[in-house]
């Protein structure tokens, strides 16, 4: 299950009236519409994932595969792919084309060690509370010299209290909010909301390093020009980071 990368500015603070989703199956229909209808995945996310992923003869795992959109996309370029997710309703879509497993990240107890060539996640890492366990578990199941690819909303974007503001000269700047502190926000999702966990970039890289992952490539990217043209409210944010993509080597 992924969170729409564009509508994060609609997030409310944890003391808001919207309760976080407990059963992800209740928003499965909403997610199918979001995944199919948001061109940002094709325009901005797919090129980043293509750059970070590498062909491998060992199995590839999509961590939080949802309905399997990235599993189907990967078939064009890289090797055998499987998926896991907490939503049985979305896995029912993904299983039509790929092997899948019901799981609750960060646990990968259903997998034996040294099983995968690559693991990747797209807009799922922000939903995992314990990132130390995430990096340790993925490190357990990926072979030596294997890789981990993570694409997330940029931590500058997920920090509670962050957001754009315009000065008297009409220049757009970014308010950092509580960037240096770990925190949470609730993001509207269908009739409910999901809890997103904010960590600074330094926290993320340190946690990965402590689990034995070596940083190989990191990409910071703004919202693409096509998305900004479609929604003029994003004008002035062309140089503000919106996405972070990282590849680590085991």
Q: Where do the PLM segments sit?
A:
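Conserved class I S-adenosyl-L-methionine
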Residues: 2-56, 69-73, 90-93, 148-182
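Class I SAM-dependent methyltransferase SAM/SAH-binding core
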Residues: 61-63, 67-108
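A short acidic, Gly/Pro-enriched loop at the edge of an enzyme's catalytic core
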Residues: 108-119
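A short SAM/SAH-binding and catalytic strip from SAM-dependent methyltransferases
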Residues: 117-131
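Short alpha-helix
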Residues: 183-184, 195-218
